Amino acid sequence: MKLGRNWIACFCVFAFALTTFAQEQEAVRPSGVPEPLAKDSPPKATRARSRHPHAKIKAASTEEGDQVSPPPVSGGVPATGARSVMMVDARTGKTLYEKNADEIRPAASTQKLLTALIITEHGFLDQPVRVEFSDTLAEPVKLNIKPGDTYQRIDLLRALLVKSPNDVARCLARDNAGSIEAFAEAMNQRARELGATHSHFVNPNGLPVPGQYSSARDLSIIARAAYANPTIRSIVCLPQLAFRYANGRTRELENTNKVLRRSPYCNGMKTGYTEAAGHCLICSGSRPGRDIIVVVLGDSTAVWRDASALLSWGLWM
């Protein structure tokens, strides 16, 4: 009988200890919290985020504290009325989209990117350039520089890329090669070196002349080379420029690229228009981890809207 009482007492002590242990375990993991996952088996959402390193990129900002959300990207490539379009990755040259990219067309002032590239690669941008009378024989867009005036090469280059004056293009070209014809040959040689083999240039400004042509694909190749040039990139992104004439007068030049003011992601490049070429534009844009170049040729006045839409689509596709 005494043995039975001892056994009952031991059983009660064991049951009490077991109950206490279970309560302590429940206190460690409150009710409603799921069992922890194994370390080598993360939740599906975590694994998905790890495959998209840009998923948490901050929104672009135009001013401190003024954030611009990424544009929504849905559906296919934005429709445009342009005759030719070429979109490439500025770093790799990979084609992102093309439309009649090999169609031979006049390039208008977009070919001034090649003019600027040759001038920049030649160097000596702090050297003086003296304007000659033949430089001023260009219409219709002019800066009205005067024969005999002297400017630094870099100042003329900035004006060329921001406001696109044709007299400045002639001045830089003649100063570089000795004549417009010699500079045009330099343009064709440099284009071939870059791989733009379906183009032929006759003048440095893009005004219409027989035998001058390019294509959206070739211009994207030239634009990539220009985009890789730090001097050119530092200029084409300027929304405006104060140009100081030789007589001391200052003129504010507004960038002809309206996409710079429409899109916070745009950082250049070059506009163009003639009646034969239509509205043309090469524009570049970037976000963290991505740089693209869009070439639009033979468009209407909708070129700004079209290029902005293509730029956003290409950056956030």
Give the residues covered by each predicted segment.
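Bacterial N-terminal signal peptides
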Residues: 9-17
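Domain-terminus/edge residues, biased toward the C-terminal soluble/receptor-binding domains
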Residues: 197, 208-317
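N-terminal secretory signal peptides that target proteins for export/translocation
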Residues: 1-3
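Boundary at the C-terminal end of the N-terminal hydrophobic targeting segment
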Residues: 20-24
